[in-house]
Amino acid sequence: MAAEKKKFNVDAWEPKTQVGKKVKEGTITDIDYIIDNGLPLLEPEIVDALLPDLEEQVLDVSLVQRMHKSGRRARFRATAVVGNRNGFVGVGMGKSKEVGPAIRKAIAHAKLSLIKVRTGCGSWECGCGTAHSIPFAAKGSCGSVKVELLPAPRGVGLVAGNVAKAVLGLAGIKDIWTKTFGDTRTTYNFAIATFDSLNNLNFVGYLPEHKKTLGINEGRV
């Protein structure tokens, strides 16, 4: 499914957490402040209020079953990704007896898992110093799926599977090479492995002089 933007009415929102109340009052006006200070992100409406340009995309809806003493019980499992195509992305999963609630749960979970993405230009073939790719290679995994992200020169595009392409695109990355291992047909594992590799970029240390040469940027460009 294509990514969608939805309008959020802040006035109709009744926050339940301290962070949510501060956002509605206008005390907190930037999502960076919440993420950088490790504040609890417990309401998806916080993300809606601070990132109005956020897009939502459903990656997969599947029917899952489990055995119970009364017999088989079937539920729908949805996988979704959210992002603003400019340094913020989140992936989530939701389950329910109906498709609609499962999708809504997945989108809400994706918003609560939102991270800042570190972008840059780490390809030796490019060296333009702009935030069109990633500054260095990164790996991530989920279940049997392993994903490796490699910096690519400008103009290459997103060389990745459809699921990884959706996650990387909503994160704001324009050029990248990827390597995948394991059963990538499992949409949720593939999406989380890609998300995990993006998140692992934030834990790579670098020297101050590399910030300019690699064009390292965190969050919005």
Curated annotation (Swiss-Prot):
Record GO cellular component, one term: cytosolic small ribosomal subunit
Limits of the S5 DRBM domain: 54-117
Example of a GO MF term: rRNA binding
UniProt cross-references to Gene3D superfamilies, sorted A to Z: 3.30.160.20, 3.30.230.10
Keywords: Ribonucleoprotein, Ribosomal protein, RNA-binding, rRNA-binding
InterPro entries xref list: Ribosomal_Su5_D2-typ_SF (IPR020568), Ribosomal_uS5 (IPR000851), Ribosomal_uS5_arc (IPR047866), Ribosomal_uS5_C (IPR005324), Ribosomal_uS5_euk/arc (IPR005711), Ribosomal_uS5_N (IPR013810), Ribosomal_uS5_N_CS (IPR018192), Ribsml_uS5_D2-typ_fold_subgr (IPR014721)
Entry annotated with the keyword Nucleus: no
One Pfam match: Ribosomal_S5
A biological process from GO: translation
PROSITE patterns: RIBOSOMAL_S5, S5_DSRBD
UniProt keyword annotation of Manganese present: no
Domain writeup: The N-terminal domain interacts with the head of the 30S subunit; the C-terminal domain interacts with the body and contacts protein S4. The interaction surface between S4 and S5 is involved in control of translational fidelity.
Family membership noted in the UniProt record: Belongs to the universal ribosomal protein uS5 family.
Subunit structure: Part of the 30S ribosomal subunit. Contacts protein S4.
Function in brief: With S4 and S12 plays an important role in translational accuracy.
Protein name: Small ribosomal subunit protein uS5
Biological source species: Methanococcus aeolicus (strain ATCC BAA-1280 / DSM 17508 / OCM 812 / Nankai-3)
Gene transcribed to yield this protein: rps5
